[in-house]
Amino acid sequence: MAHQAHAYHMVDPSPWPLTGAVAALLMTSGLAVWFHFHSMYLLYLGLTLLLLTMVQWWRDIIREGTFQGHHTPPVQKGLRYGMILFITSEVFFFLGFFWAFYHSSLAPTPELGGCWPPTGIYPLDPFEVPLLNTAVLLASGVTVTWAHHSLMEGNRKEAIQALTLTVLLGFYFTALQAMEYYEAPFTIADGVYGSTFFVATGFHGLHVIIGSTFLMVCLLRQIQYHFTSEHHFGFERAAWYWHFVDVVWLFLYVSIYWWGS
């Protein structure tokens, strides 16, 4: 970025939005190829390009915000509104899945046997792995808040410990979810129950992976002394996102696992 005599957000030309879009195209195409032709090459190519884009884009943002001082108060205000709008859009994204679930379950059609869960579907016990997953995510919400308070108080060591614990809990949740999927007595092909269950919980799982990655970057930055007690914008946004993921899971648990079973 050239020298500027104002505090406003002027973004340098960047290739990363384009490479990110190409990665998204390759991954969605790769997913279709994997489903129909059992080949994962295109999917792996998309994932590799996405990984490279993430690393380079994060590097640029860190350089601009931490080392060049471009994240002035007006810039932070704009980024804050951007994150609020992004999370709002995510709320509506998940609202569509809940709508589909309740539309199907509150008035089951004769094709489903007139009951919910549909005839022949054996739902998962909500008081086994799903309840453990709920406890894990709620605990991670506590640890991320602990990390935030430690950061604001200038307690570097505790912030690192709490953030490490949060990331580990995030990955533990993902492992439990993968195990649950592997052992589930129904598949995504099992009618409206299977599709609403796997799409809603699957997209939530994807958001947990994204949030865990976001927090892992924050952990690495905290270890590198990038955050101060006054300026830790990236961490705050990651914490917001993590709390959003927590709340979505509570709705999923109550709706799909507990009430829906």
From Swiss-Prot:
InterPro entries: Cyt_c/ubiquinol_Oxase_su3 (IPR024791), Cyt_c_oxase_su3_dom (IPR033945), Cyt_c_oxidase-like_su3 (IPR000298), Cyt_c_oxidase_su3-like_sf (IPR035973), Cyt_c_oxidase_su3_a-hlx (IPR013833). The chain crosses the membrane at residues 16-34, 41-66, 73-105, 129-152, 156-183, 191-223, 233-256. Component of the cytochrome c oxidase (complex IV, CIV), a multisubunit enzyme composed of 14 subunits. The complex is composed of a catalytic core of 3 subunits MT-CO1, MT-CO2 and MT-CO3, encoded in the mitochondrial DNA, and 11 supernumerary subunits COX4I, COX5A, COX5B, COX6A, COX6B, COX6C, COX7A, COX7B, COX7C, COX8 and NDUFA4, which are encoded in the nuclear genome. It is a multi-pass membrane protein. Residues 35-40, 106-128, 184-190, 257-261 are mitochondrial intermembrane. Disulfide bonds: none annotated. GO terms for molecular function: cytochrome-c oxidase activity. Belongs to the cytochrome c oxidase subunit 3 family. Its main location: mitochondrion. This is Cytochrome c oxidase subunit 3. The lineage of its organism: Eukaryota, Metazoa, Chordata, Craniata, Vertebrata. GO terms for biological process: mitochondrial electron transport, cytochrome c to oxygen. Keywords: Membrane, Mitochondrion, Mitochondrion inner membrane, Translocase, Transmembrane, Transmembrane helix. PANTHER family: CYTOCHROME C OXIDASE SUBUNIT 3 (PTHR11403:SF7), CYTOCHROME C OXIDASE SUBUNIT III (PTHR11403). PROSITE patterns: COX3 (PS50253).
